[in-house]
C-alpha cells in the first residue's frame, strides 16, 4: 500500500510538472510564432530576401528555429506554426507588415493607407574625406566580407560630418535594401522630434495627451520623459522571456 501511494505521488508530481510545462510553453507560443511570422514577412516582402536565407540567419535561435513557416507570395502573408499554435503576418503597401491578431485577414488587407504629401529630399548622400574612407576600408572588408568580428553583418555605413565615408553591403543587398533597424529607430525618431521642436511644431516638455493616463500620476509624463526613458513606468525589455516588450511586439 505504501509503495502504491508513493507511486501515485510520483505520478501526480510528474503530471503536474508536465501540465505546468505545457501551460508555460503555451504562453510563449504566441511570441514564438509571432516573432517568426512577422520577421520573416518583413524580410521577404520589405527587404526582398529569400525565405531560406532568413530562416538560416535571422530565425535560427531558441524555439524560433523550430517553427514551420509558409510564405504565400500571392496573398503576401507568412504563417508560422509551432506545435499546436500558429501566427499569420500580412504585408500591406504603405503599412509594411502587421501581425493578424483577431479580426479577418480580408478586412486588414482592405484597410486603406493614408498617403502623406511627398517631401523632396536628396536622393543620395555626398561622399567626403577620401583619407578616412581609405582607413575604414580594411574594417569594412573584415566586418562584411570576411565576418572577422563574428555574426553576419548586412551593411556597414559610416557618416562623418554629414558626408558618407564608408559603405559596404552583404552580397545581394545595396543602398536600396530596407533593413530592420531595431533600436536604431530610436535615434532617428529623436532626431526627427528634435527638428520638430526646433521648428516649434511640438513641445516635448508638455504632458502627453494619452486618455488612459489622465486619471492617475501618469498624466504628468512628458514626451521628453518618454524619449529619455525616464518616465518611471515599470517595463521589462528582456527579449529572452515572456516580457512586456515581447508581449507588446509579438502576442
What are these regions (language model features)?
Residues 1-27:
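N-terminal Sec-pathway targeting helices
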Residues 27-49:
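Alpha-helical transmembrane signal-anchor/signal-peptide segments
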Residues 34, 46-94, 102:
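Membrane-embedded, hydrophobic transmembrane alpha-helices
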Residues 79-80, 137-173:
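A short, well-structured edge-of-sheet supersecondary motif
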Residues 81-148:
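Non-catalytic propeptide/linker segments at domain boundaries
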Residues 161-162, 179-205, 226:
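Active-site SXXK
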Residues 198-234, 238:
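Active-site helix/loop module of the DD-peptidase/beta-lactamase fold
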Residues 231, 235-251:
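A small/polar active-site loop signature that marks catalytic segments
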Amino acid at each position: 500500500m505504501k509503495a502504491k501511494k508513493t507511486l501515485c505521488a510520483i505520478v501526480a508530481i510528474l503530471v503536474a510538472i508536465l501540465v505546468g510545462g505545457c501551460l508555460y510553453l503555451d504562453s510563449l507560443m504566441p511570441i514564438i510564432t509571432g516573432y517568426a511570422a512577422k520577421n520573416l514577412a518583413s524580410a521577404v516582402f520589405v527587404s526582398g530576401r529569400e525565405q531560406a536565407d532568413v530562416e538560416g540567419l535571422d530565425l535560427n535561435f531558441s524555439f524560433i528555429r523550430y517553427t514551420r513557416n509558409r510564405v504565400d507570395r500571392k496573398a503576401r502573408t507568412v504563417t508560422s506554426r509551432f506545435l499546436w499554435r500558429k501566427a499569420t503576418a500580412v504585408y500591406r503597401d504603405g503599412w509594411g507588415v502587421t501581425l493578424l491578431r483577431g479580426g479577418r485577414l480580408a478586412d486588414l488587407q482592405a484597410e486603406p493607407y493614408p498617403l502623406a504629401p511627398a517631401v523632396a529630399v536628396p536622393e543620395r548622400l555626398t561622399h567626403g574625406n577620401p583619407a578616412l574612407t581609405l582607413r575604414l576600408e580594411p574594417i569594412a572588408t573584415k566586418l562584411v566580407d570576411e565576418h572577422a568580428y563574428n555574426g553576419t553583418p548586412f551593411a556597414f555605413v559610416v557618416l562623418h560630418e554629414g558626408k558618407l565615408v564608408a559603405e559596404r553591403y552583404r552580397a545581394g543587398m545595396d543602398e536600396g535594401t530596407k533593413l530592420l533597424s531595431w533600436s536604431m529607430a530610436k535615434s532617428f525618431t529623436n532626431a526627427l522630434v528634435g527638428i520638430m521642436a526646433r521648428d516649434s511644431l511640438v513641445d516635448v516638455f508638455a504632458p502627453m495627451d494619452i486618455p488612459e493616463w489622465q486619471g492617475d500620476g501618469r498624466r504628468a509624463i512628458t514626451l521628453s520623459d518618454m524619449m529619455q526613458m525616464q518616465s518611471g513606468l515599470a517595463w521589462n525589455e528582456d527579449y529572452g522571456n515572456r516580457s512586456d516588450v515581447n508581449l507588446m511586439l509579438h502576442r
